[in-house]
Amino acid sequence: MKQPVRVAVTGAAGQIGYSLLFRIASGEMLGKDQPVILQLLEVPVEKAQQALKGVMMELDDCAFPLLAGMIGTDDPKVAFKDADYALLVGSRPRGPGMERADLLKVNGEIFIGQGQALNEVASRDVKVLVVGNPANTNAYIAMKSAPDLPAKNFTAMLRLDHNRALTQVAQKAGVAVADIEKLTVWGNHSPTMYADYRFATANGESLKDKINDPAWNKDVFLPTVGKRGAAIIEARGLSSAASAANAAIDHMRDWALGTNGKWVTMGVPSDGSYGIPEGVMFGFPVTTENGEYKIVQGLEIDEFSRERINFTLNELEEERAAIADMVK
């Protein structure tokens, strides 16, 4: 058996946390041969801490062979101590009458604190995934607040958009999700994201050619993927928690264990690829190997795609401007 690794999860007693923790503890994220120690963070509020205790009791009651230990805390420095992986799930949701700029600032405070704590106590190789929205900008803030950790260690979750897009394309083309390769999502995890199947194939056949419906792409596909979260809230009365947790598992598993040359989508700090300014936390097609991701290079960006990429980039630049005074 391998040595246990430490996995920190924030917002651990929330909806997504509840869908996530049991899957991490069962080995779905890091493999069936990798023991884990869960380090669980919740806000310093009695109700949340009580709920966290209940979740930990349930984790105990599963008797997972791979769960080598567990702590629950309200202190980020305890939760992130020596963490090898950190899933930052907890964030402040938008309340009634709250402007987006207010939301950015409120979450900015949270992610500055968490970035600083990671900087101070986490493993120097910690892999950080920000799930809490606005995920790209929260990840950017955490990254900027952790100057002693490599910027590449910080990522934002676009895998939910990616997975949503996969299923829509599979259903339209009449192919199996598992057979689709080379689909990607560019930009921000928001309705402005650009899901792109121009390069995608199923069993070697071009999906763009198979679908061959530009009107569907623009008027049905992109709005459906972009507004899927809102559609789920409307239908279920609650936000998409299980599918978000599933996407977080996918993102971390692929980052840790590799994609064998397959493309996946990750929000990563730009290296200037495709004209995206350096440092912007942006969804790109990537491949991963040995715990490192690489942005897929050399893809042609046509006029429609450039327009959509600029649109989502502009939103990210506006978000960055809104919190510019908070991060150096």
UniProtKB/Swiss-Prot annotation:
Catalytic residues (UniProt): H189 (proton acceptor)
Keyword Secreted: no
UniProt GO BP: malate metabolic process; tricarboxylic acid cycle
Tagged with keyword NAD: yes
Ligand binding (NAD(+)): G11, A12, A13, G14, Q15, I16, G17, N107, Q114, V131, G132, N133
InterPro entries linked to this entry: L-lactate/malate_DH, Lactate/malate_DH_C, Lactate/malate_DH_N, Lactate_DH/Glyco_Ohase_4_C, Malate_DH_type2, NAD(P)-bd_dom_sf
MF GO annotations: L-malate dehydrogenase (NAD+) activity
Residues annotated for substrate binding in this entry: R94, R100, N133, R164
CDD domains the record matches: MDH_chloroplast-like (cd01338)
Keywords linked to the UniProt accession: NAD, Oxidoreductase, Tricarboxylic acid cycle
Catalytic activity field: (S)-malate + NAD(+) = oxaloacetate + NADH + H(+)
Domain of life: Bacteria
EC supergroup of this enzyme: oxidoreductase
EC number: 1.1.1.37
Any single Pfam family the record assigns to this protein: Ldh_1_C
Family to which the UniProt record says this protein belongs: Belongs to the LDH/MDH superfamily. MDH type 2 family.
Biological function: Catalyzes the reversible oxidation of malate to oxaloacetate.
Cross-referenced NCBIfam families: MalateDH-SF1 (TIGR01759), PRK05442.1 (NF003916)
Entry protein name: Malate dehydrogenase
